[in-house]
Design a protein with these regions (language model features):
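A structural signal for multi-pass alpha-helical bundles of membrane permease subunits
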Residues: 29-311
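Short, Lys/Arg-rich, polar N-terminal cytosolic tail immediately upstream
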Residues: 1-28
């Protein structure tokens, strides 16, 4: 009897341990399962984001041949050369000028057009479509259109103004001209985001303000701007980042010229890599641009806590 009791006890304990083991395996599988679904994303990010970023850091501290193959490690020598280069500082100045010329007008014009389209007027749908058209045009065809507009002899702009200014060939006007094209390209996206925010403002708020005798400008300042501040923050963020990364229209319209008057940092990176064959210098400049954009982004998110009002 004692032996049978011991056998039964062992069998029960084995069954319990098996159940516990299966339960633990099931629990472990449940916890690990979400990570398996993330593996494809990790592979893609690893191949196309993390690996290129690490390779850029390594190349920025090395010398390379004309094919971009690493020859030897040189530490921070490339950064020292860049930081003592007048061309690099010119690119920094041109980049910040371009960012200011593009970001502020793009946001302001997009907001004013959204205010106009939000009013209940005849033909609003037509206006909305017209304002959205630039968003559907790529930088290459846009550059062709604006090259014709800016043409010094046959361009419609000089014809209207009665001048013969070389908008893209005169260093005084080239950066402004490229900024105008970029603003035009940005307006559509800014418009649609801000118009969406305006349409989400409760009409009761505006009606109450009107009953209280508030002027239109007062309503915009005290009601509209706080209510659309999340969309406004997003639009400002996107426009700043896009302005720092602008390349296509600059390459097609001016190729960084005349002189270096439109040679923004991204175009300087392109020129160093594919014209001068100095991939290490291009990588070093790319990392500096990354740091600048990171600082700008952190400053924006610091401002978000004070200036953005979520409903």
């Amino acid at each position: 009897m004692t032996e049978q009791y011991l056998e039964l006890r062992d069998m029960k304990s084995n069954d319990i341990s098996k159940k516990v083991s299966l339960k633990n395996k099931s629990e472990l599988k449940r916890k690990l399962e979400p990570y398996f679904y993330l593996i494809p994303a990790f592979i893609i990010f690893g191949l196309f984001v993390f690996y290129p970023f690490v390779k850029t850091i390594v190349m920025s501290m090395s010398t390379t041949n004309i094919r971009g193959q690493i020859k030897e490690f040189v530490g921070l020598e490339n950064f020292k050369e860049i930081l003592t280069s007048p061309e690099f500082y010119n690119s920094i100045v041109v980049t910040f000028k371009f960012v200011v010329m593009v970001a502020a007008p793009s946001v302001i014009i997009g907001f004013l057009l959204a205010l106009l389209a939000n009013n209940k007027l005849r033909g609003n749908r037509v206006f909305e479509l017209m304002f959205l058209l630039p968003m559907a045009i790529a930088s290459a065809p846009a550059a062709v259109i604006w090259t014709m507009i800016f043409h010094p002899t046959n361009g419609i702009l000089n014809y209207v103004l009665g001048t013969q200014i070389g908008w893209l060939t005169d260093s005084k006007f080239a950066l402004i001209s490229v900024a105008i094209v970029t603003v035009w390209l940005n307006i559509g996206l800014n418009f649609i985001f801000l118009l969406t925010g305006l349409k989400n403002i409760p009409s009761e708020l505006m009606e109450s303000a009107s009953i209280d005798g508030a002027s239109y400008l007062t309503k915009v300042k005290d009601i509209v701007l706080p209510m659309v501040s999340p969309q406004m923050f997003l639009v400002i963020f996107m426009n700043l980042i896009n302005a720092f990364q602008a390349f296509g229209q600059i390459k097609l319209l001016t190729q960084g010229g005349p002189g270096d008057s439109t040679n923004v940092l991204v175009h300087s990176i392109y020129r160093q890599a594919f014209f001068n064959g100095r991939f290490e210098m291009a990588c070093a400049q790319a990392l500096i641009l990354f740091v600048i954009m990171m600082i700008v982004t952190l400053l924006q998110f610091k401002f978000e806590k004070k200036g953005v009002h979520y409903q």
